[in-house]
Regions:
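Conserved catalytic-core motifs of GNAT/GCN5-like acyltransferases
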Residues: 33-41
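Glyoxalase I/VOC metalloenzyme domain signal
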Residues: 2-9, 14-32, 44, 51-223
Length: 223
């Protein structure tokens, strides 16, 4: 899913409980292929990833509070977002990659250099976004988009590629400059609701089907 400004979606994350028991809700609708699991050394987080044809959904949790709240990692607000995922913080994050060489985000960023990346590489986090909005982060070092089509075939459900991402936000506060710029670029849309909700559109939506995973996960899938 590519927007204007040379950016494209790499993945979306949602904060979840330890070891991602919420995977069962995804499996129940047919997204039941084996998830890719990893730990982020030195960052204190772990994940389980469910692939679509062109991107993936990352369920992420904190497994080491000390690492996640360390001086290196604390500015990412991963701990703050995870700890308050049910009490006001937006539990989502939008991971971006360049679609064209030299592309950069259309908003101010700051570099996060976790220990699991080689020296000189960074993940560029959006500056000035509130916890009530999703985390935005850009990975300039990523190469060509991975082809997940074969992995996606392991699901009973064949939803196709992710074609749209909409995040509903509570309240009436105007969007931060970063989120407004990302919406203008066509990568993600924002709506309003009583609670945070991630809406993922898949394929051509020809099946006309929808799955609301709430309250287990604040996610609605359309395909």
């Amino acid at each position: 899913m590519t927007g204007g400004g040379g950016l494209q979606l790499d993945h979306v994350f949602v904060m979840c409980d330890a070891e991602a028991p919420e995977l069962a809700a995804l499996a129940a609708i047919g997204l039941d292929g084996p998830p890719r699991r990893s730990r982020h050394a030195g960052q204190g987080t772990a994940n389980a990833c469910v692939v679509f044809e062109n991107a993936f959904l990352e369920l992420i949790w904190v497994h080491d509070e000390r690492e996640t709240r360390s001086p290196l990692t604390a500015p990412t607000r991963l701990w703050d977002r995870w700890a308050a995922r049910r009490s006001g913080a937006c539990p989502f994050g939008i991971g971006l990659r360049p679609a064209t060489p030299g592309a950069v985000p259309p908003y101010a960023t700051w570099p996060y250099q976790p220990t699991y990346l080689p020296a000189g590489m960074s993940i560029d986090f959006a500056a000035g976004t509130p916890l009530e909005e999703p985390e935005l982060f850009f990975m300039a070092f990523t190469g060509a988009r991975p082809d997940f089509r074969e992995l996606a075939k392991q699901h009973t459900l064949a939803p196709g590629p992710i074609t749209s991402v909409t995040i509903d936000l509570p309240g009436a506060a105007p969007l931060s400059p970063a989120c407004a710029a990302l919406q203008a670029a066509g990568v993600v849309s924002f709506g309003r609701a009583d609670r945070h909700v991630l809406r993922i559109g898949c394929g051509a939506r020809a099946a006309g089907r929808s799955a609301d995973l709430r309250p287990t996960l604040p996610i609605v899938l359309d395909w």
